[in-house]
Curated annotation (Swiss-Prot):
Membrane topology: Single-pass type I membrane protein
Keyword Repeat: yes
GO BP term, pick one: immune response
Annotated protein name in UniProt: Killer cell immunoglobulin-like receptor 3DL1
Lineage of origin: Eukaryota, Metazoa, Chordata, Craniata, Vertebrata
Transmembrane segments: 341-360
Residue numbers on the Extracellular membrane side: 22-340
Key words of the record: Cell membrane, Disulfide bond, Glycoprotein, Immunoglobulin domain, Membrane, Receptor, Repeat, Signal, Transmembrane, Transmembrane helix
Molecular-function GO terms, alphabetical: HLA-B specific inhibitory MHC class I receptor activity; molecular adaptor activity
Domain of life: Eukaryota
Glycosylation sites: 92, 179, 273
Chain residue ranges for the region called Disordered: 315-334, 375-394, 409-444
UniProt free text on domains: Ig-like C2-type domain 2 mediates specificity through recognition of the Bw4 epitope.
Cellular location(s): Cell membrane
Amino acid sequence: MSLMVVSMACVGLFLVQRAGPHMGGQDKPFLSAWPSAVVPRGGHVTLRCHYRHRFNNFMLYKEDRIHIPIFHGRIFQESFNMSPVTTAHAGNYTCRGSHPHSPTGWSAPSNPVVIMVTGNHRKPSLLAHPGPLVKSGERVILQCWSDIMFEHFFLHKEGISKDPSRLVGQIHDGVSKANFSIGPMMLALAGTYRCYGSVTHTPYQLSAPSDPLDIVVTGPYEKPSLSAQPGPKVQAGESVTLSCSSRSSYDMYHLSREGGAHERRLPAVRKVNRTFQADFPLGPATHGGTYRCFGSFRHSPYEWSDPSDPLLVSVTGNPSSSWPSPTEPSSKSGNPRHLHILIGTSVVIILFILLLFFLLHLWCSNKKNAAVMDQEPAGNRTANSEDSDEQDPEEVTYAQLDHCVFTQRKITRPSQRPKTPPTDTILYTELPNAKPRSKVVSCP
């Protein structure tokens, strides 16, 4: 009797195991994408279907049932490589596996994996508020925004295969944006982030990635010390070097400046006094600024020490109040765009001054000519005193003689020459015995 019971139990267990695959039982496999489910257009991704018992074969299924030719009617072994990836590959995937002892029986569908293809729109921008250096236990807001009206934004951290975080975009002041809250900050959340945007009708076709943003957690290690050589107060043009040091065996030091968007890093060097130090040359001093430094280890590049005490570097003999970041060019080099604007403005001002001078000169000339032409032709009029001033140093007096014949030159001013020849002829002669500037008039 007992033998019969045991036999029936074994048969029942066998039937349950046989029915499981056909009925879509609990033998659910696990589908993963490597290296990431976020794939640039033209890139590659490998889909793998895992199960606690090794599958001989598996099949892929796409949620939207848009058949890609390479999928149709094919059975794959272990993994499937998509390359090159196109927008047609974007979508939601599942897999089913077959059992070695049951080639016709398939497992239940796996977990879904969403393949997102990037590079279909212009990249958005990614910012950290209040900043990318976050103290352990605090929170940071990563804001993704664009002037393209994206309906959804995605935030993805490098090195992880899980689906990116997704938020609905909010439109404000002509831009679309989403705020991703990260925290409480810990080492697992630190790393390099990028964000993407998408529109409603193609939710799995994303924009190009934003520029990478490194989020660093600070505070796990003791702070280093920061000093300035030759000192924190220097004359304008004097060279300055900032030294970051500690007795902790840091592999790397990082120098940051308040208000600066970037940091500068240098490897630590062991000194004879058993300290580890890095010297940051800043070059000739032109401005002032407040600096801090951090230490980090090679095995954990996104985990930094507490910041050093702030060091204020001031420059005497220079009215400027802030010093450019070590990674930013000196202000003396100028901004090429601003330089072009300055040159263009100067040229316009010079041309305006020249035009104004020309118009003023033309106006004065016309006014002078009009005054001369308005004078009545007086027969009993002396020559203009200005004519006498333009002659030789010896003053000469002219007399107007009517109907006299002399061998002197005939003078007719071009500005007073009438269009029709006059009937009378006026001759001028020099009178050497006349008094200077006197006027002798001969009446007819």
